[in-house]
């Protein structure tokens, strides 16, 4: 069963730079060159009407790919994400140009990933 942890591990295995929420560039550790990925965990909620007895949580997980252009290289990376990371979950995909960063963003949103709640 895919969980947010499993999806993050799969994304890390692609070999691109990846971080949670945002890269915080410093002089000693600058933001990596494009392409890179950012993952987010925007929401978690109890699952089911009997959420206490079944002890389940439903997480949302988002992966953002940032590339220089919306070109063949970006499409190859998106194909790898879809085939190697997201192959067993439903997702919504958005592609947009980010003017302020002079790059393209592909965002994948996955909702309702079930996991056992921590006790």
Give residue ranges: language-model regions:
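Short intrinsically disordered coil segments
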Residues: 52-58, 78-81
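Residues that cap or initiate secondary-structure elements
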Residues: 43-45, 69-71, 114-118
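Short, basic, helix/turn surface patches
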Residues: 47-54, 117-119
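Hydrophobic beta-strand residues in large extracellular and virion-surface proteins
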Residues: 7, 11, 18, 63-65, ...
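Small/polar-rich, solvent-exposed N-terminal microdomains that initiate assembly or binding
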Residues: 1-51, 72-76
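Sterically constrained small-residue positions within well-ordered secondary structures
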Residues: 30, 54, 99-101
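Acidic-leaning, charged glycine-interspersed low-complexity segments
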Residues: 76-119
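Oligomerization/assembly interface segments of phage tail-like spikes and tubes
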Residues: 55-69, 102-115
